[in-house]
């Protein structure tokens, strides 16, 4: 198996005490956030569950500033998500009750990749994002912790793979320091998510 499973992601969430507002793990049919007055987070796969999934992304709703944060470790635009995975974030937002409100929601998303396309670590990066959101809810992307990651132009063949590989090393070190569950399953996580797992460069 490559990547991280639903059960592994749930165990990491619990290990890092990120359960507050966490709705769970979903596939591409995620209905959206339906309670706009509460903090809510979710990890979503761009593929259907019955086919094993494809790529993990994560969403987080901050109700005070009414911001929806969308984090894709590969930094794909909506057009690229549709092209590569037949998955649309815009459609997901429109399905949500957030679209039917007297307040305008602000959508913030990353425009750079932090994960190399040669790795299977999207799920782990989603966990890291939710950790950042837990402590820096209103400005997660600008938080000092998230800014530890190098950003690169999204591409199937990365132009700066060494920077993205540095992110992977940082990610492993971070999770190893913070999560007992990650430490106990360190070898499995590394083997299933390491750089060079997929031949892209």
From Swiss-Prot:
Annotated GO biological process: proteolysis
Keyword Heme on entry: no
EC number, as in UniProt: 3.4.22.39
Compartments where found: Virion; Host nucleus
InterPro entries: Papain-like_cys_pep_sf, Peptidase_C5
Domain of life: Viruses
Induction statement: Expressed in the late phase of the viral replicative cycle.
GO (cellular component) term, any one: host cell nucleus
Alphabetically ordered keywords of this record: Autocatalytic cleavage, Disulfide bond, DNA-binding, Host nucleus, Hydrolase, Late protein, Protease, Thiol protease, Virion
Catalyzed chemical reaction(s): Cleaves proteins of the adenovirus and its host cell at two consensus sites: -Yaa-Xaa-Gly-Gly-|-Xaa- and -Yaa-Xaa-Gly-Xaa-|-Gly- (in which Yaa is Met, Ile or Leu, and Xaa is any amino acid)
Gene Ontology terms for molecular function: cysteine-type endopeptidase activity; DNA binding
Family matches, as Pfam families: Peptidase_C5
Active site feature: 55, 72, 122
Predominant location category: virion
Regulation: Requires DNA and protease cofactor for maximal activation. Inside nascent virions, becomes partially activated by binding to the viral DNA, allowing it to cleave the cofactor that binds to the protease and fully activates it. Actin, like the viral protease cofactor, seems to act as a cofactor in the cleavage of cytokeratin 18 and of actin itself.
Site (Cleavage): 52-53
Job description of the protein: Cleaves viral precursor proteins (pTP, pIIIa, pVI, pVII, pVIII, and pX) inside newly assembled particles giving rise to mature virions. Protease complexed to its cofactor slides along the viral DNA to specifically locate and cleave the viral precursors. Mature virions have a weakened organization compared to the unmature virions, thereby facilitating subsequent uncoating. Without maturation, the particle lacks infectivity and is unable to uncoat. Late in adenovirus infection, in the cytoplasm, may participate in the cytoskeleton destruction. Cleaves host cell cytoskeletal keratins K7 and K18.
Subunit structure: Interacts with protease cofactor pVI-C; this interaction is necessary for protease activation.
Note: All late proteins expressed from the major late promoter are produced by alternative splicing and alternative polyadenylation of the same gene giving rise to non-overlapping ORFs. A leader sequence is present in the N-terminus of all these mRNAs and is recognized by the viral shutoff protein to provide expression although conventional translation via ribosome scanning from the cap has been shut off in the host cell.
UniProt family annotation: Belongs to the peptidase C5 family.
Identification of the protein by name: Protease
Classification lineage: Viruses, Varidnaviria, Bamfordvirae, Preplasmiviricota, Tectiliviricetes
């Amino acid at each position: 198996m490559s990547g991280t499973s639903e059960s592994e992601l749930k165990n990491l969430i619990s290990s890092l005490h990120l359960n507050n507002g966490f709705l769970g793990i979903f596939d591409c049919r995620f209905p959206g956030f339906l309670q706009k007055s509460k903090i809510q987070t979710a990890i979503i796969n761009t593929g259907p569950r019955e086919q094993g999934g494809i790529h993990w992304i994560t969403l987080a709703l901050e109700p005070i500033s009414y911001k929806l944060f969308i984090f894709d470790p590969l930094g794909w635009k909506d057009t690229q998500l549709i092209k590569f995975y037949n998955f649309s974030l815009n459609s997901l937002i429109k399905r949500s009750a957030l679209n039917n409100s007297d307040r305008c929601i602000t959508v913030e998303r990353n425009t750079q990749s932090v994960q190399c396309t040669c790795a299977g670590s999207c799920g782990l990066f989603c966990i890291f994002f939710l950790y950042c959101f837990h402590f820096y809810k209103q400005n997660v992307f600008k938080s000092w912790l998230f800014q530890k990651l190098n950003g690169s132009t999204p591409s199937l063949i990365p132009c700066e793979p060494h920077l993205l590989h540095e992110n992977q090393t940082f990610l492993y070190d971070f999770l190893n320091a913070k999560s007992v569950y990650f430490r106990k399953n360190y070898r499995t996580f590394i083997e299933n998510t390491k750089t060079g797992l997929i031949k892209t460069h």
